[in-house]
Amino acid sequence: MKENAASRVVFILLLFLSVSLLNGQSPPEKPKLVKCRSPGKETFTCWWEPGADGGLPTNYTLTYHKEGETLIHECPDYKTGGPNSCYFSKKHTSIWKMYVITVNAINQMGISSSDPLYVDVTYIVEPEPPANLTLELKHPEDRKPYLWIKWSPPTMTDVKSGWFIIQYEIRLKPEKATDWETHFTPKQTQLKIFNLYPGQKYLVQIRCKPDHGYWSEWSPESSIQIPNDFPVKDTSMWIFVAILSAVICLIMVWAVALKGYSMVTCILPPVPGPKIKGFDVHLLEKGKSEELLRALESQDFPPTSDCEDLLMEFIEVDDCEDQQLMPRPSKEHTEQGVKPMHLDLDSDSGRGSCDSPSLLSEKCDEPQAHPSKFHTPEGPEKLENPETNLTCLQAPQSTSGEGKIPYFLANGPKSSTWPFPQPPSLYSPRYSYHNIADVCELALGMAGTTATSLDQTDQHALKASKTIETGREGKATKQRESEGCSSKPDQDTVWPRPQDKTPLISAKPLEYVEIHKVSQDGVLALFPKQNEKFGAPEASKEYSKVSRVTDSNILVLVPDPQAQNLTLLEEPAKKAPPALP
Amino acid sequence: MDSKGSSQKGSRLLLLLVVSNLLLCQGVVSTPVCPNGPGNCQVSLRDLFDRAVMVSHYIHDLSSEMFNEFDKRYAQGKGFITMALNSCHTSSLPTPEDKEQAQQTHHEVLMSLILGLLRSWNDPLYHLVTEVRGMKGAPDAILSRAIEIEEENKRLLEGMEMIFGQVIPGAKETEPYPVWSGLPSLQTKDEDARYSAFYNLLHCLRRDSSKIDTYLKLLNCRIIYNNNC
């Protein structure tokens, strides 16, 4: 009997259970917490997912406790967050504290609790999308037009105090395009978009993110229509211009490369170097100086007969201690283009000497100064070439008055090489010998064997010098001079005489013989100097010929039989013979 | 004669010093507001705050990454989190827990809290690097970040001391800071226990770096931008 009762009870229970199961009633399934999110690090909301409710009405509760506390709290707000949510307000939110949250499902059959969720609000921050997204097309003057996008921070975020740090991302695209153009802004709440295609409809979206947390959702799309007449900078034109200029540059570079040198010379012509007309460098290289010089000769140099007329040179013949006959350049003379030479005055003779080094160098350099046909002076070495007709004879130099270099041409009627006259101011007043007569004496003393010739020379020299004075006095003095000159052994007596009798002479300027011309064979053509003071109408021309040059550099003059003036000859001839031994 | 020469020498040396000082001072940045004297006054407060905020942000990023890496590798399904509650050695510091509390805290207090946190993490960071190195199969991601965090922490501490000197001149920094004593648990032989200890440490590091970062950003907006960020 008892056994029957027990088995009956079990059977009934089983029936009851099976009946209830068949009805679908059971304790609820464990709910599941889905996520918790904080929009601004000040509040947060948790959502759960309910399980099967077991066929019976089920209540869900959320309980939690904080880290470091034992007290269990229930969710303060089930509604704000929507169904199956729990909203924690500011009062209930603590940062940097772990929340242990559990959701319980309760129905008639039982209670089911979810797995606990450990939540730290710091790490569950996900803001709302930015709000108030506005789009505006702007056309400022003098600047490119653009699309101006503005927005404001999402709700529930305190950005001003710095509690919530936020960054934004905007994306836009033409309506029919597939790819979005994204822009990132770290803080600001506006953005300007340039380079928009006119006639298109653009869609714009924005989202944001906290400094540490999750990206928000994209905001709803905003759209804007770009009008057809929207001015946009056309880059294709600029590209065309750039390509064209590049092509032009390439062409120019190529042209320069091909004709580089000629173009350079066209733009920057080379500085012309010195060039001698008629001067062939190659001839010089070959060493054929004769041809070279002939080429130079042909260049209308030296001056022709005109120059001969112009050549007015005086030879100062005077005696000196050294007993040398020295040709002296005349005081006055300026040839066309010929520059006066400066004579150095030696201390010994009181005369400018031809052998002074500076003078020699001057004379050597003289052709350079001469406005000749030569374009460039080729150098002093050339001048010393005897074939050039421009010679400076390099006589041995001596410190004393001896060995004075006569300066004369080697050949050719090159008037430019004649010693140039020096200005009268340079003449030393120390000259004590200033007439040919004295020189004659010297010459007599020097060359005894050539007395006769010297006599003749004397005569002619006298004749030559005589022309300076046309007055009788002058002649008288000349006669006296000639007397003195012809007495050879009486040098001692001769000497004072001219000095005594030559007060006039001494007061007078030096007597000169004019060199009329120099012929081909070295003939000095002299003629008396015209003295305007005396109104000398003397136009006769007398010539002396240089017969030779002695070893001691004495010019030996010989009478020119062709151009003798008989009247002049007579007088000295009368008086000379008695004086002759 | 000697004195004359030496005085000349001295004057020349002085002149040289002055000139060199002037030349060196050319490279100094911006104009400082310097109540503390010429000691640390070469960078403006704004620049100091900018720099500090950058560094604190960086440290927090690194800490988060390191924690996530460790969690993914060693803590899956182990329930270490349960043990991590109340395990931070810096919990004794009275740090504000929400925005209102933080906004009501004076900046002096906030700054000294920051300094205390930074100082209290010097030692644990050093040991963390050592111990992670010795960890079996430790991924380079964790180790490199640990090294970087240790370095940046020192830098931030220096910067914070400078800021403190400028904002609160004359204040003495004698606040005590919490001492970490979790080294034995890092070195225990029980692997689970050791990993749990590491987990705790990384969890606390992530949290404290977040605190420092948030407080600094708050101070930056308050002091430099006058609550108008």
UniProtKB/Swiss-Prot annotation, chain B:
Disulphide linkage map: 34-41, 88-204, 221-229
Major site of localization recorded for this protein: secreted
Role description: Prolactin acts primarily on the mammary gland by promoting lactation.
Keywords: Disulfide bond, Hormone, Lactation, Phosphoprotein, Secreted, Signal
Annotated organism of origin: Bos taurus (Bovine)
Gene Ontology CC annotations of this record: cytosol; endoplasmic reticulum lumen; endoplasmic reticulum membrane; extracellular space
Name the UniProt record assigns to this protein: Prolactin
Signal peptide start and end residues: 1-30
A Gene Ontology molecular function term of the record: prolactin receptor binding
Record-linked Gene3D superfamilies: 1.20.1250.10
Keyword Phosphoprotein: yes
One Pfam family from the record: Hormone_1
Assembly: Interacts with PRLR.
Domain of life: Eukaryota
Keyword GTP-binding belongs to the record: no
Biological process terms in GO annotation: biosynthetic process; blastocyst formation; cell surface receptor signaling pathway; female pregnancy; inflammatory response; lactation; long-day photoperiodism; mammary gland development
